[in-house]
Amino acid sequence: MAFDNFEILYKETRLNLEPASPSSVVQLRVAPTNAYGRSSLSSSSSSRPASATADDEKGYRTKNLATASSIYYRKHHSSPRGFLWRVLDNNTVLSIRVADVCRQEKVADAPLILNLRFASPLRPACVGFADHEDHDALFVYAIDQSNQLWSIILRPDHFRKRSATEGGLGDASRVYSPPGFGFKHPHRLAVVSPDQLIVTMHDGGILKFDRNKNHESHGSPWRESIYNVAGWGQSLRGLVPFQRNPTVRYEKINMELTAAASTAVTTMGHAETAFLFTICLDHRMRVWDVRTGQILYTGDILNNTKRDPQEVGKWTVDPSQNNLIRILDNGRGQCLVVTYSPVGAGEFKFWKVKANDQGSIHVTDCFPDARLMSPNPTSLDVWTLADFAIAQQPDGPELWALWKNNTSYRVNRLQIIPRNATAPFADGWKAVCVESPGPTPRASGSWNPTDSTEKWLDLIFSPGRFSKSTLETALAMYEKGLGTYKETVSRSGKGIAESICSVIGSTTTLDRSSQGGADYDQFRNTSETQWMRFWRLLLELDKQRGEALSLVFDQYDGMVWVTCADLLAAVRQCSDLERLYHNLQSPEKKNEDVAALISAGLTFVETFSDSMHQLCKAALRAELYENSALSDRERMQLFLDRAGFWVTDEDWAQVLDIVGQNYQMVTSRLYEDLFDLITATSEANSQELREPFTIFGKKVVVRAVQETVELHWQILFSQLILLVNMVDSESEEARPLHTRFDVGSVYRRLIDALRRLEHLRWMTKTELSVSPSKSRSGSSSPTLSKRGQDESYTRTALEELAGHLFGLPESNNMPLLSSITDLVLDLCAPTSTTVLNTWLIQCWLLKEGRPDLALELMPFAEQDPFSTYVQGRVFLALRDYDTAAQHFRKAAIGLSIPLKHVDRHSAGLLDDTEWNLLNSGLPNYYAHIVNLYDKQKAYSYVMEFSRLALQFAQTSNQDSASIKTEMLSRLFTASTATSHFEEAHSALLAMDDEALQKSYLRKLLERMCESGQSSELISLPFSGLQNKVDEILAEKCRATRDVLNGVPYHQILYAWRISHNDYRGAAAILLDRLEKLRRSGEGDKLGAEDGENGAGNDALDTQVTRQYLIVINALSCVAPQEAYILEDVPPPVPGKGTNDEEYSQTGSKRKLGKLNATSGEEDLDSRIEELARLLDSESAGDKKARPSSSSEEDQQLLERMQKFSTAVRQEQGQQTPRRLLRLEDLRKQYQQELDRIVAIQNNQFALTADGEDEDEDMMDIA
């Protein structure tokens, strides 16, 4: 029977072995031996391999493809239990990683990969592992080509923490040079226990190593024992020339026919000894007693007792065949041994072996009258057995076989029926569906919704499809073909995708067509051709990665693995739909109609052109992502119109041949059977997890989901196309489909199932780069050292966001290959128990700063209020504030209604304070939205939602009052920031907190003045705040030093007071500006100097004279009896007298006398200040011009007045002294200023400052 005719019950899932992060790879260099037998094993400073990218196929195989690989499972310890090991890089690197699918709940994951680099290449067939019962460690043994025996002990922490290997392994790594290898060549290594090893030699003998536990530090760690097939005599005669037995040449060594090609070790439950089974080159099986070194049994592996001794070559086994025997223990003292003979067509043989405590053994043929031959190949190519495994099932032994033809392989399973001795193999071989090379790329054209480059990038960079080394090597080889490759070219700073696009893009140019325009069709065709070349090169390289190396069966979990050169394939059981699909030509009797329906849909869609496929997918996207209010019939008609089907009679005839005329086979029951195939029958996924999946196990699930999604989508998509076309083409004369069953219901269920698959497809193809500290996976990678914590790892969205839901449930007693299928089927089912909350995924993406990915999930979002709110958060993060506001307004009612139980899950996007604002009324909800926009500084939307919050806020309770205060504050701030001063003014007047109101009033005035909105400021009423506005502006005026630059507060206050008819106040503030102008020396800048060109200006027109005119004009607007100003008297400047220079040295005594004669009704502080100014003025003059007695008298008077006023100042605030200036005084001062300017122009300068009578009419008041 050919492979293709086997019933397919299983499906393989290939895993890419490329690490998710470079930091998870630990490079350990094993140095040569030292004088004490210990190796120097140190950790590399870099977490990345030092080897460069291979630029040809040979270098690619050397650096990236393993020559030997398998999985070792420990017996005594389970955390971790399985280890995948690979021999790489010309046999110089032994790579080991944990390969457990599940882990104990409280045990940390082990994500690290240890690469042990040896100085001398290893012998791939001489690598072994052991597990000590008393020590939780992995014992690694290896023999290199320099005949050194390496012994390395790896603890679980070595696979969990980088820090465990930073200082090297120390005494955990040892090397030994056996003297027995001096004249014998090792061929196979068999590990009996951590303390006992066996090496088979080229001459048929064995070398046993027993650990010397009592040896000193300088002694030998192993005790050697040599045993031979025919004793020492025969062995020595073999060394004599011309007297040797027939040999086989292998790797430059002449192998004796008694040498072992394949070995297996078992104890059969005996603690005292072990038994070594060897399949030798002479086609015989020998059983050794490891304890004594005696051969207990010798026999042909096919139990052929009639072999011709002269036909030695016919029955010779190739020395490279190292997988010819497997042992299955069946209890104490007995086991089942399965051997395979590669001679001829190949044949399996089953042996029952019994052993007693005395060391004797009994071997019998289980089925002497039955033969199990190898299945026939699928073609003329030769298929050979690469490996096989035996497992115990309730119905009997189960045989798994791996067949190989170059880089292709097949896996088959055979259930043995021991009770049927005459026909134990009657159940027949069952096949495993091997993954196809990849989807066939469809042609690109104007009908494609995406660019051709984007299509190819999506295909090439599909998660888990190609490794980075494969892409880099293919690109280098492609460049070599173009003649543009340079070894020195550095791609630093460029990603591999960018490099590929750059190289392929350089081969295509946009030329002009014959009509003179751009020839886009030619450009597209040329680009497509180059991409197809690169794609084929990738497939050829990737095909080498799939070369099978070994087959492993996990007895504990019931899982089958195929290790390949650069891949690992997990064999899982097919779901019902997968089983039906892969056996479509020979379905089971109960599924014949469903198989016909599926076959009809697939056959119909296969006839579509590439453009028709794209149109159908575009119509489907609109149907999946749009919420339509149309009826089912209208929706199907709209789908037909959008797709624009063009079906020929021949294409439709194929469908009718399958489903019958008038679709008589199509019934509601048939569609129910179809939906049952994609519905999970187990509720195991909804139970509590007993053993969560590891990072490695999650990769298996994700890859299986990718395959299942594509298969389900292909079948359901074809069924949808078939359904709408059957409805469209049905005849009213016959009985139409819609009269037989509810076609609309089937249509909706197909759409819902496809929508679920599209959601999963997005999650399995979208990769996230996440730092270990932000992982949702809990213990996925908690043990990376500080050096690795800064490096991110790449995982799919499904693995990162839903990986914590993957695991084995409490009640699960099924094999792992079935449990994985059930989990995957439940994930893909429309009625899955695993709910993929789109809003929760979007919250996590927003928390991680990926709103672009969150936007892609919007078509899958639900329509509930919180989901709508999350969509608003997505657009808010993308700074699409208007769309975000629409979603926030839509969700307002639903998120403002109080609920008894609120599910507070947002992946950390919302804190407790924000949650408290939801479902607690519209004011709180809108206040929360205001906070969100405020963080984005979107002040126009802050204003909008602040108004909404204020609209619904009730002032009857304290909470609403606080919300009102906060919203008024936010409204004011936003309005001020956006220069909506009228809105800010309204918010300011509505504030109840006077302190807050005054603070914001100051901010508003400052903002309006700084932005030049003084006219709008004056137009605002400021009801009840006018005095405060005047006061704040007056403070700003007093604080202003430079009145010519900066904000013109004096002019603003002048205009404010003029608008409120306060002419005296307006004149007073300008008088202050006049004084500051005079102090700054503006009065000395004459008009001719102050002009732009220094000529053509009035010399009397200065800043000071103009200011005098404005003040005089302001006072002229009031009644004459009110035309005065109360001016603050500034403190004098020492040595310069008062502001108006009215106090001269010669008139000081008269002024002091006048001050002493002043009525006691005057303000005491004013008199003290006046006296102080007089004293300061006199101290600056000539001390000889005044009597000392008068000065002392004045000083004593000032001290008494200051002491007297101390008590008064404690009760009353100290006031600034002021004086009265009438309109006549200002005009007089203006005239004096003009005279002074004229005198300066005429070069007339006074030598003294007399003029003591010029201010006789001025009165100082308080």
Curated annotation (Swiss-Prot):
GO CC annotations?
A: nuclear membrane; nuclear pore
Q: GO MF annotations for this entry?
A: structural constituent of nuclear pore
Record membrane topology: Peripheral membrane protein
Q: Enumerate the InterPro entries for this protein.
A: HEAT_Nup120 (IPR056548), Nucleoporin_Nup160 (IPR021717), Nup120_helical (IPR048884), WD40_repeat_dom_sf (IPR036322)
Q: What is its main location?
A: nucleus
Question: What is one Gene Ontology biological process annotated in the Swiss-Prot or TrEMBL record?
Answer: mRNA transport
Region Disordered, residue ranges: 36-58, 770-791, 1128-1196
Return the PROSITE patterns for the record. Answer: WD_REPEATS_1 (PS00678)
Q: Does the keyword Transport apply?
A: yes
Q: Where is the composition biased (Low complexity)?
A: 770-786
Question: What are the Basic and acidic residues biased-composition ranges?
Answer: 1165-1185
Alphabetic keyword roster: Membrane, mRNA transport, Nuclear pore complex, Nucleus, Protein transport, Translocation, Transport
Purpose of the protein: Functions as a component of the nuclear pore complex (NPC). NPC components, collectively referred to as nucleoporins (NUPs), can play the role of both NPC structural components and of docking or interaction partners for transiently associated nuclear transport factors. NUP120 is involved in nuclear poly(A)+ RNA and pre-ribosome export, in GSP1 nuclear import, in NPC assembly and distribution, as well as in nuclear envelope organization.
Assembly and binders:
Component of the nuclear pore complex (NPC). The nuclear pore complex (NPC) constitutes the exclusive means of nucleocytoplasmic transport. NPCs allow the passive diffusion of ions and small molecules and the active, nuclear transport receptor-mediated bidirectional transport of macromolecules such as proteins, RNAs, ribonucleoparticles (RNPs), and ribosomal subunits across the nuclear envelope. Due to its 8-fold rotational symmetry, all subunits are present with 8 copies or multiples thereof.
Protein name listed in UniProt: Nucleoporin NUP120
**Species:** Chaetomium thermophilum (strain DSM 1495 / CBS 144.50 / IMI 039719) (Thermochaetoides thermophila)
